[in-house]
Amino acid sequence: MTETTPKTAPWTVQKRTAVLVLADGTVIEGKGLGATGAVEAEVVFNTALTGYEEILTDPSYAGQIVTFTFPHIGNVGANAEDIEDLTPANRHGAVGAIFKADITAPSNFRAAEDLDSWLKHRGIIALAGIDTRALTALIRERGAQNAVIAHDPNGNFDLDALKARAANWCGLENLDLAKDVTIGQSLVWKELPWTLQDGYGEQDAPQYHVVALDFGVKRNILRLLTGLGAKVTVLPATATAEDVLAHNPDGVFLSNGPGDPAATGEYAVPTIGKLVETGIPLFGICLGHQMLALALGGRTEKMHQGHHGANHPVKDYTTGKVEIVSMNHGFAVDSDSLPENVEETHVSLFDGTNCGLRVVGKPVFSVQHHPEASPGPQDSHYLFRRFINLIRERKGQAPLPESEQAA
């Protein structure tokens, strides 16, 4: 009998097929996934454990590369129902993604394809196999980083050229990205929130009419409005106050979106200022919140690293309660700049930054976080009922209980 010695495959070093090049010249190598090519963007980190498809398709992430701090990715696959941008063909949202581990094979009854294939279809360049904790710590210490992410299956990179691109990119300040992600023409949104029994239904008996200005709106925001009985007419970001009022709305919604609020505000702030004076109930989220503050005489500023995640504690001064919310913003309202007739209603318990405001004596309010998201409990869904109640009050109707869930 011949003895055989068990053989152990030697360690292999995978060839780099993707790189992240920071503006300071730092090069991080790893495995490329998703689309190929190279793109400049701002690198941020997101602390959410779930919802990667919703995160990557959120138009507020336009011009950004998302580092996922949770190590596992791809376990629920991807589908066409969980995207957040209004026009999937235009692929608005994050341009890059960074993962600790390789993509996991999907195991979910709603999965239509694996994450790698989905990234390719969306045109998102991804980098895996790096120390995301170290990158997150770097961003925490130095701030959000301008960078280039590149993917070449052959591993051929001109690092000097990529370093130059990263160093010369202008960054998000002074960039109006809302014009790139907004719809081209108006539309009426009727889709209702998803249920296990029926999927997405359709609103067929609206009680109110809300006009939404689309600076990069998420689908689930619109669904929660229709779920409360609203017909929602969505208008492009460049719509004027006259355009909005021509639809005779019961309420006006200012959506989330990407980029610098001061840049988008060049055309949006005058519109918002006129709408505030009409007495029509007005509700803003994220970028809409920031531009409302500008219209009221406040200021906004670029944040060091921004807030991106689903575990952010926010205090609502109007109720005294603390909510765990989803956030995605790199600019913030300067609380000290708000005029006397504007009250701060919400504040971040992480760093004390402004997260909400209301105008004294007017049916106008806004929040920085995303109340449509549900990181566990639906802590902030009451804000949609608060908006609808302002509409009902103007119509002489009794208010809905805020404590009930909106979806």
Curated annotation (Swiss-Prot):
<feature type="binding site">
    <location>
        <position position="330"/>
    </location>
    <ligand>
        <name>L-glutamine</name>
    </ligand>
</feature>
<feature type="binding site">
    <location>
        <position position="290"/>
    </location>
    <ligand>
        <name>L-glutamine</name>
    </ligand>
</feature>
<dbReference type="InterPro" id="IPR029062">
    <property type="entry name" value="Class_I_gatase-like"/>
</dbReference>
<keyword id="KW-0067">ATP-binding</keyword>
<keyword id="KW-0028">Amino-acid biosynthesis</keyword>
<dbReference type="InterPro" id="IPR035686">
    <property type="entry name" value="CPSase_GATase1"/>
</dbReference>
<feature type="region of interest" description="CPSase">
    <location>
        <begin position="1"/>
        <end position="205"/>
    </location>
</feature>
<feature type="binding site">
    <location>
        <position position="60"/>
    </location>
    <ligand>
        <name>L-glutamine</name>
    </ligand>
</feature>
<dbReference type="Pfam" id="PF00988">
    <property type="entry name" value="CPSase_sm_chain"/>
</dbReference>
<feature type="binding site">
    <location>
        <position position="328"/>
    </location>
    <ligand>
        <name>L-glutamine</name>
    </ligand>
</feature>
<dbReference type="GO" id="GO:0006526">
    <property type="term" value="P:L-arginine biosynthetic process"/>
</dbReference>
<comment type="similarity">
    <text>Belongs to the CarA family.</text>
</comment>
<feature type="active site">
    <location>
        <position position="372"/>
    </location>
</feature>
<comment type="subunit">
    <text>Composed of two chains; the small (or glutamine) chain promotes the hydrolysis of glutamine to ammonia, which is used by the large (or ammonia) chain to synthesize carbamoyl phosphate. Tetramer of heterodimers (alpha,beta)4.</text>
</comment>
<dbReference type="InterPro" id="IPR002474">
    <property type="entry name" value="CarbamoylP_synth_ssu_N"/>
</dbReference>
<keyword id="KW-0547">Nucleotide-binding</keyword>
<feature type="binding site">
    <location>
        <position position="257"/>
    </location>
    <ligand>
        <name>L-glutamine</name>
    </ligand>
</feature>
<protein>
    <recommendedName>
        <fullName>Carbamoyl phosphate synthase small chain</fullName>
        <ecNumber>6.3.5.5</ecNumber>
    </recommendedName>
</protein>
<dbReference type="InterPro" id="IPR050472">
    <property type="entry name" value="Anth_synth/Amidotransfase"/>
</dbReference>
<keyword id="KW-0436">Ligase</keyword>
<feature type="binding site">
    <location>
        <position position="331"/>
    </location>
    <ligand>
        <name>L-glutamine</name>
    </ligand>
</feature>
<keyword id="KW-0665">Pyrimidine biosynthesis</keyword>
<feature type="active site" description="Nucleophile">
    <location>
        <position position="286"/>
    </location>
</feature>
<feature type="domain" description="Glutamine amidotransferase type-1">
    <location>
        <begin position="209"/>
        <end position="397"/>
    </location>
</feature>
<keyword id="KW-0055">Arginine biosynthesis</keyword>
<feature type="binding site">
    <location>
        <position position="259"/>
    </location>
    <ligand>
        <name>L-glutamine</name>
    </ligand>
</feature>
<dbReference type="InterPro" id="IPR036480">
    <property type="entry name" value="CarbP_synth_ssu_N_sf"/>
</dbReference>
<dbReference type="GO" id="GO:0006541">
    <property type="term" value="P:glutamine metabolic process"/>
</dbReference>
<dbReference type="GO" id="GO:0006207">
    <property type="term" value="P:'de novo' pyrimidine nucleobase biosynthetic process"/>
</dbReference>
<comment type="pathway">
    <text>Pyrimidine metabolism; UMP biosynthesis via de novo pathway; (S)-dihydroorotate from bicarbonate: step 1/3.</text>
</comment>
<dbReference type="GO" id="GO:0044205">
    <property type="term" value="P:'de novo' UMP biosynthetic process"/>
</dbReference>
<comment type="function">
    <text>Small subunit of the glutamine-dependent carbamoyl phosphate synthetase (CPSase). CPSase catalyzes the formation of carbamoyl phosphate from the ammonia moiety of glutamine, carbonate, and phosphate donated by ATP, constituting the first step of 2 biosynthetic pathways, one leading to arginine and/or urea and the other to pyrimidine nucleotides. The small subunit (glutamine amidotransferase) binds and cleaves glutamine to supply the large subunit with the substrate ammonia.</text>
</comment>
<dbReference type="InterPro" id="IPR006274">
    <property type="entry name" value="CarbamoylP_synth_ssu"/>
</dbReference>
<dbReference type="GO" id="GO:0004359">
    <property type="term" value="F:glutaminase activity"/>
</dbReference>
<dbReference type="GO" id="GO:0004088">
    <property type="term" value="F:carbamoyl-phosphate synthase (glutamine-hydrolyzing) activity"/>
</dbReference>
<dbReference type="GO" id="GO:0005524">
    <property type="term" value="F:ATP binding"/>
</dbReference>
<keyword id="KW-0315">Glutamine amidotransferase</keyword>
<feature type="active site">
    <location>
        <position position="370"/>
    </location>
</feature>
<feature type="binding site">
    <location>
        <position position="287"/>
    </location>
    <ligand>
        <name>L-glutamine</name>
    </ligand>
</feature>
<dbReference type="Pfam" id="PF00117">
    <property type="entry name" value="GATase"/>
</dbReference>
<dbReference type="InterPro" id="IPR017926">
    <property type="entry name" value="GATASE"/>
</dbReference>
<comment type="pathway">
    <text>Amino-acid biosynthesis; L-arginine biosynthesis; carbamoyl phosphate from bicarbonate: step 1/1.</text>
</comment>
